[in-house]
Amino acid sequence: TLDIETTATDPADGELVSVGVGIHDRADPLTEATYGTFHRADGEASLVDRAMTRLAAADADTLVTYNGRGFALPFVEGRLDRLGADVDLPIIASPPDHLDLFRDRKRRADETGAAWPTLEACLESYGHAPPKTVWRGAPLTNGRFGEELGPAYLRTLGTETGARFRASLTEVVDHYLLGDLEATLALYYADLGESVAGTYLGTERRS
């Protein structure tokens, strides 16, 4: 699985902050999934290259995402285009190897006039408790990440005094990102009728 964290939803306005990659063998418990989180240290192209190298090295047969085809990968490609950077995405990032769990749900919602379901709502419909990251006294959401946490992290780059603050912010980003990665895998298995227990499901981190 793959997830990204950004400062906005439009690649013309926002930047990549972090990318997460999760690898899981269906024969193993979900708790044995391995995750890699990649954060901005220098440029966005370098961030993408590190994450995509990890994804390609997994040699998986399917990439499972939640809105990866509609948002995550188009955002990545949009940022690379704007930067004039040449980073190849692995074949698994494209259909038919890429299964986006959001697409059918979005289509059904559009047909009925319902709101698009969040990953958290989908998990709860199966009885799973989503992970919760609480930062500065309030739950961290995609909106707060883009408006507050992401920009706060980027402001620490390139400064010696920001290194310690960046380390603490990275811990927050990691829990948020890892929670989304595991949640996507758990939803995939729930859609298949398989009940799984995770490492991050139902956990809460406060900072």
Question: What residue spans do the PLM features occupy?
Answer:
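Short alpha-helical basic/polar micro-motif
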Residues: 58-61, 182
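Conserved short-loop catalytic and cofactor-binding motifs
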Residues: 39, 64, 172
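Short, low-complexity, polar/charged sequence segments that are solvent-exposed and flexible
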Residues: 18-21, 40, 82-85, 117-118, ...
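Conserved RNase H-like, two-metal-ion catalytic cores of nucleic-acid enzymes
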Residues: 1-58
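Active-site flanking residues adjacent to catalytic metal/cofactor-binding acidic residues
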Residues: 2-4, 66, 99
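Metal-dependent phosphoesterase core characteristic of DEDDh/y 3'-5' exonuclease domains
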Residues: 30-31, 68-192
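Acidic catalytic cores of enzymes that act on phosphate-bearing nucleotides/polynucleotides
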Residues: 189-207
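Proline-aspartate-enriched helix->loop->beta-strand connector
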Residues: 60-68
